[in-house]
């Protein structure tokens, strides 16, 4: 099982009101310059919110939620400090998230 950490908010807030693109660009540049593999993903309408243990989060962001998921708890805590109005939490899952499993293509 892998522990995934997440920051959760409404899609409108994260995609329209916050400089999320800038945050991700800076983070990706940092990872690339340090030869680290990307360990975070932006997931609209995350299915993990349907788990019974996640009901409190689903109630906080009931419609059109979006999650930033990572295996790095420090990054998620940093996002909470950087962005502010997000819920943070964690869950365990046997799913292995990767560029391949999410069909992510690097654009050059």
From Swiss-Prot:
Pfam family membership, one: Ycf54
Subcellular localization, as worded in the UniProt entry: Plastid, Chloroplast
Alphabetical keyword list: Chloroplast, Plastid
Gene3D superfamilies recorded: Uncharacterised protein family Ycf54
Keyword Plastid: yes
InterPro entries, per the entry: Ycf54, Ycf54-like_sf
Any single GO CC term annotated in Swiss-Prot or TrEMBL for this entry: chloroplast
Similarity field: Belongs to the ycf54 family.
Protein name: Uncharacterized protein ycf54
Gene that produces this protein: ycf54
